[in-house]
């Protein structure tokens, strides 16, 4: 199972400014879409922050509607790791049953499927998504949601996680918050394949984290990071 490490650096002279502004390091991951819709981790910044994780996921269900700024409260969830290439039934007892194979079409490896078998009379619509655990400066952040999608009774959600990590600073939202879009400048760290370790450093002139050496030397032209900032 692949494991990844992301190191985020902030210059000591910039850190007090970031903290005074109430900014937090924010991470998100896309699932079955071009951009993320849930804040995975919201982290109090330090001069060096290390995040590590494995490509293992769980599936959760919530009664919280998919709306901007809503905080996800999980009704039920599977263990991590859930089995990819399989499907899980969310039963009328509001628990997950699975994994199960087969189905038409079958679930591809690397994807996860949840079927909403709760009666419409009980819950007309529920929210499903994936969860993932990370270690932040050696402290566990367990089973945090990374995605959210509305699923009507009798319907299903097919979820395919990606390995890219979106990184930015913001002050409005905490972990497990649904967002309709990422506002402001952000970076995308491109993990996957042979890339399992990336170091980024905050560039206050661009307002984003850019590629850097482990010693903090900026590398603006690295192919490992996509910068989304108007001045770049």
Give the location of each predicted region.
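Intrinsically disordered, low-complexity segments enriched in small/polar residues
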Residues: 1-232
């Amino acid at each position: 199972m692949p494991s990844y490490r992301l190191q985020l650096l902030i210059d000591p002279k910039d850190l007090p400014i970031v903290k005074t502004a109430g900014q937090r390091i924010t991470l998100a991951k896309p699932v079955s879409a071009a951009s993320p819709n849930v804040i995975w981790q919201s982290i109090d910044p330090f001069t060096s922050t290390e995040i590590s994780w494995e490509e293992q996921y769980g599936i959760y269900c919530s009664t919280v509607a998919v709306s901007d700024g809503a905080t996800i409260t999980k009704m039920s969830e599977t263990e991590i790791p859930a089995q990819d290439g399989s499907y899980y039934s969310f039963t009328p007892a509001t628990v997950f049953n699975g994994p199960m194979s087969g189905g038409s079409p079958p679930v591809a490896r690397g994807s996860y499927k949840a079927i909403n078998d709760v009666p419409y009379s009980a819950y007309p619509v529920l929210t499903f998504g994936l969860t993932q655990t990370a270690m932040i400066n050696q402290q566990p952040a367990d089973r945090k949601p990374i995605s959210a999608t509305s699923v009507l009774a009798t319907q299903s959600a097919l979820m395919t996680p990606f390995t890219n990590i979106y990184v930015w600073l913001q002050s409005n939202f905490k972990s497990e918050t649904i967002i309709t879009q990422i506002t402001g400048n952000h970076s995308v760290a491109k993990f996957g394949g042979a890339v399992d370790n990336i170091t980024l450093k905050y560039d206050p002139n661009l307002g984003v984290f850019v590629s850097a050496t482990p010693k903090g030397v900026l590398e603006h032209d690295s192919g490992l990071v996509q910068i989304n900032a108007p001045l770049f």
